[in-house]
Each structure stands twice: as structure tokens, then as C-alpha cells.
Design a protein with these regions (language model features):
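Mixed-charge (Asp/Glu-Lys/Arg
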Residues: 1-38, 43-145
């Protein structure tokens, strides 16, 4: 499983996320994470031609993605990286303020539950969840926190 912390480290998590994008039809998939990435760990073009920018947060249970991290990504994902769809994927969860900020800014949150569903093929890809999705969108779950 993509969220198996014993099988993956942070670099492998970024690669596994990129592999899911490839599996689900994205093109030009690139792992760009590392020092100086300005929040973009994976970039791709969705099957319908939109630019996808993903930040991967490889966190342990109980270590949630916070508002400050979300705001840093929010400051670069659309302006610097020119994302049509911005996504934060985590092996954990999001704090309420982080999820609220993401919703206000149009950033898609993929927590450990959604990650398992996406990885297992039982849930949608992140680009089908966002406010700019071309299909019917899924509202922000209230159980993220």
C-alpha cells in the first residue's frame, strides 16, 4: 500500500505518488521534490490536459499537515508552478485550519483514507476531487480532522 510507512520513505512516497498519476493516465509526470522545489514534489498533466502540482507530506500517524505548511504551498502552487490543480497528499491527516485554508484556495486535500482509496483503485484520482474538476466534484469531507 502507498501509505505503508514501513515499505516507503519520503522519496519513495513521492515516486509512488507519481506512479499513481501515470497509472491513472497523466502525462509528463515528473518527481521534482527536494531542496528548492518550492512545494512541488510531483508535476504532471492530467488526462484532460490540466497542469497538476502535488506536494507530498510523508507524516506519521498523529502528525497532521498544518495550516502553515498549507499556506506555504498555497503561496507557490498557482503563481510559481502555474497549477490548474494543486494537491497535497499525506500519509496522515490535515488540521481543521489547514483543510479550511485549502478549501478557500482551491487546493485538494488527500488524506490517508483518500490515499488508500486512490492507491487501491476504489477512489477517485485527486484531479477528480478539486473545484476545477471537469466531472461532478466531491465536497470536502467533514471527517478529515
Amino acid at each position: 500500500m502507498i501509505d505503508d510507512r514501513e515499505a516507503f520513505g519520503p522519496d519513495e512516497f513521492e515516486q509512488a505518488t507519481a506512479d499513481l498519476c501515470l497509472r491513472d493516465g497523466c502525462a509528463e509526470v515528473e518527481v521534482v521534490g527536494g531542496a528548492g522545489d518550492l512545494g512541488a514534489d510531483v508535476t504532471a498533466v492530467t488526462p484532460d490536459g490540466r497542469r497538476l502540482v502535488i506536494q507530498c507530506k510523508y507524516y506519521g500517524e498523529g502528525n497532521k499537515v498544518g495550516s502553515e505548511e498549507m499556506q506555504r504551498f498555497g503561496g507557490t502552487c498557482f503563481t510559481v508552478h502555474e497549477a490548474d490543480i494543486a494537491v497535497v497528499v499525506t500519509t496522515s491527516e490535515f488540521t481543521r485550519p489547514a483543510a479550511e485554508y485549502a478549501e478557500q484556495c482551491g487546493i485538494v486535500c488527500v488524506d490517508v483514507r483518500r490515499l488508500r482509496e486512490w492507491g487501491g483503485g476504489t477512489g477517485p484520482a485527486p484531479w477528480a476531487l478539486g473545484p476545477r474538476a471537469t466531472e461532478e466534484t466531491t465536497p470536502l469531507d467533514q471527517d478529515l480532522w
